[in-house]
Amino acid sequence: MASTTLSDLPDVILSTISSLVSDSRARNSLSLVSHKFLALERSTRSHLTIRGNARDLSLVPDCFRSISHLDLSFLSPWGHTLLASLPIDHQNLLALRLKFCFPFVESLNVYTRSPSSLELLLPQWPRIRHIKLLRWHQRASQIPTGGDFVPIFEHCGGFLESLDLSNFYHWTEDLPPVLLRYADVAARLTRLDLLTASFTEGYKSSEIVSITKSCPNLKTFRVACTFDPRYFEFVGDETLSAVATSSPKLTLLHMVDTASLANPRAIPGTEAGDSAVTAGTLIEVFSGLPNLEELVLDVGKDVKHSGVALEALNSKCKKLRVLKLGQFQGVCSATEWRRLDGVALCGGLQSLSIKNSGDLTDMGLVAIGRGCCKLTTFEIQGCENVTVDGLRTMVSLRSKTLTDVRISCCKNLDTAASLKAIEPICDRIKRLHIDCVWSGSEDEEVEGRVETSEADHEEEDDGYERSQKRCKYSFEEEHCSTSDVNGFCSEDRVWEKLEYLSLWINVGEFLTPLPMTGLDDCPNLEEIRIKIEGDCRGKRRPAEPEFGLSCLALYPKLSKMQLDCGDTIGFALTAPPMQMDLSLWERFFLTGIGSLSLSELDYWPPQDRDVNQRSLSLPGAGLLQECLTLRKLFIHGTAHEHFMNFLLRIPNLRDVQLRADYYPAPENDMSTEMRVGSCSRFEDQLNSRNIID
């Protein structure tokens, strides 16, 4: 009797199985062993990202007939205008070929340096509903005002609902006239994303008012702007009121100051100044947006007495689930234990982020933990009055719901203190971000902080004791059998469900102390992101030869890494005497990476801002070639063709790409290593190899 195979399963069961497999490579593997699954996969797949060289688009198969979401932004050579290198007649033929292979496209992502590529592609799919444009290069001066957007509204006006410009560098004066010119199309837009990180000043007040008037049916609006009253046409009370009046259907609103986008870790001093946004206007805005579900206001200047407005937010926007506040003061004063105030009254929140709130105290955190009983995600940044006691209490109160915690730029919360604070959920947390700030005498510092808190805030300590009695949390008994004098567990922690870890570390520091802080047992950690930031110029040579990546080998399931040295600044060329150039720093950062069993790596090389160069060095290429298990490698910078050839020694490497996804991206191919011919030759060699599996 013949054995039963996967193909013998009924189509209904096979379809259910296929819907449970989300990983693209796993689906492709299943397609190789089952003809039924192959036919089902090809006929039902709706999302497709095309990689490979743009010159080979004619070889795209025509079996994916149900594709509705098509991403062409990662074609190689990355960052070049699609089809521009081909003769005009070939360009039209390739555009028609794409239409034939994917006839039902409704969502399109494309990298465009000029409107010519849009003029070719968009007529092929007149029923497009969503378009995402990408461009990190400077806008060409010969493009007429609004020229980047006219093809979109001209060819897709009948069905267009969503426009995403979050990764598209453009001039802010380009968009409002086009929206006015195509008023009927603008009126149908429900999603507009203008949160572009490459802006220096962002959208002006009058431009935001014009945009929201042209798009009265917006449900999602994200924009980068300037709240600083010292700037011309800054965003203040009038602008916020106009947004609420013109777009009352908003469910998602993000308004972020460009200074926060340029330097997200900045902690303003007492001289930061006040914004032109008042609590009274915020109450009016919240009243005008009753459907709001997600709100981000990162103002960059102090918003005083915001607690009253946040109390109104709870009563006016009952559907609110996600809230992020930057530079808001008085978010939760917690002056009375019996009465919750400020953001603590927003009991429906599932995600809360508080940034640079100078007057937030431990008692405020405890009140938030009591009031926001549905929190699954919590982020705190730049809150200097918060200590390990308050954060630990808040985490304990929400131990049954919290799975994602991010702690950064809090002077009283170094690495050890942060981990002690979230210890009550060490067996439940799935995603974590902390700063790697090492302390020589951690216990003494923690004890000192507690004593200082007791001396300065007796009333708050009394309230803290009452909170212990009322809440009856007993995390010590749950998580450990013995505790030290500060109430922290002395047994080893096991981070059973931790899957993603994000770390920030200052340049010149070492990663090696990380396991000794209590993060040594993470059996299910799959992905890690490490951001190294700082100025190498003037730094002494590190005492040890390596940064410490080899210490990550103790995580058995670690397979994905993002190593971001993009904000590490140094000398790309010859360094002054007694200093290290970036190639030596890159050797310091990457030494030991070959000991990790990584399958995917995103790497941002350090940069020299004076010459706008982020390039993989010879030591860097030599160390990356030691990652023998890599399958995907994306270098967010440039590299010599000779250095790229080192990577061909990685046996199973399938996908490699150079991406200058930073502003301004290198403009002239002759001044960089990212020439079309170089990239094409390397990809040809990569694709000609036999891959074992």
UniProtKB/Swiss-Prot annotation:
Biological process terms in GO annotation: auxin polar transport; auxin-activated signaling pathway; bud dilation; cuticle development; negative regulation of seed germination; positive regulation of response to water deprivation; protein ubiquitination; regulation of meristem structural organization
Tissue expr: Expressed in the vasculature of growing leaves and roots, rosette axillary bud, flowers, siliques, funiculi and stems.
Knockout or disruption consequences: Increased shoot branching.
Location, primary (coarse class): nucleus
Gene: MAX2
Domain comment (free text): The F-box domain (1-55) is required for activity of the protein and for the interaction with SKP1A/ASK1.
Keywords recorded for this protein, A-Z: Auxin signaling pathway, Developmental protein, Leucine-rich repeat, Nucleus, Repeat, Ubl conjugation pathway
Chain positions covered by the region annotation Disordered: 445-465
Repeat (LRR) residue spans along the chain: 9-34, 49-74, 75-100, 110-135, 141-167, 168-196, 200-225, 232-257, 274-299, 302-327, 332-356, 357-382, 383-409, 410-436, 480-505, 508-532, 541-565, 608-637
Domain F-box: 3-50
Pathway as given in its UniProt record: Protein modification; protein ubiquitination
Cellular location(s): Nucleus
Database matches in Pfam families: F-box_5
GO terms for cellular component: nucleus; SCF ubiquitin ligase complex
InterPro entries tied to this protein: COI1_F-box, Leu-rich_rpt_Cys-con_subtyp, LRR_dom_sf
Taxonomic placement: Eukaryota, Viridiplantae, Streptophyta, Embryophyta, Tracheophyta
Protein name, UniProt field: F-box protein MAX2
Swiss-Prot/TrEMBL induction comment: Up-regulated upon binding of EIN3 to the promoter during methyl jasmonate-induced leaf senescence.
